[in-house]
Amino acid sequence: MSPTLLSFFAEVPDPRRGQGKMYPLAPILLFTVLAMLSGAVSYRQVHAFIKTHLDRLNVVFDLSLRRAPAYSSVRFILRGLDGAALEVAFRRHAATLGTGRIDADDAATKPVCVAIDGKTLRGSFDAFNDRKAAHLMSAFAHDDQIILAHLAIDEKSNEIPAVQDLMTTLGLSGKLFTVDAMHACK
């Protein structure tokens, strides 16, 4: 059986102290992802999703949570997370969803096509604090229809070094990258 997203979330370090952990971290992260896929955009909506669907989630994921964590617990857990560790968990999970052609013998003749593109998040700027809008870079595998990786671009940088870092992280062997024309520079 292939590893699940829950098993990858189990590897994310828990930001909470040892005592008083009523809820394991991995299920809370998984339930948060499911809540967001269902349209939740706030901590309260994530809490409401978990509370409403807790019995079904326990059955589907073979868990035994007696009650949903409070809104404040969800908020505390999510705000304390290490974003880089969570990103690694998502990347490792995405790698299991692929076709596996990178390691196959035909990787040189049939490369994995990966599109890399950056997007500015609408409404993410903060004029009061003089913060520019958030800009994200994503790598998308065409055949598998999944995002392999994404990263935030620093305010004082641009897409060019971010694309180079992303390509290095993903590895060049067996891949055909498509990028915007501005990346065709020395």
Predicted regions and their residues:
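Basic, short loop/linker segments at the boundary and entry of helix-turn-helix/winged-helix-like folds
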Residues: M1-L30, S72-R75
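Short, conserved catalytic/metal-binding motifs centered on acidic residues
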Residues: F31, V46, A70, V114-K119, ...
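Short capping segments at the starts of secondary-structure elements
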Residues: S38-S42
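DNA-recognition alpha helix
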Residues: Y43-D62
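Active-site- or DNA-interface-adjacent structural scaffold in DNA-acting proteins
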Residues: L65-N129
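Electropositive, glycine- and tryptophan-enriched low-complexity nucleic-acid-binding patches
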Residues: N129-K175
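Short acidic loop-to-helix transition motifs that present clustered carboxylates
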Residues: N158, H183-C185
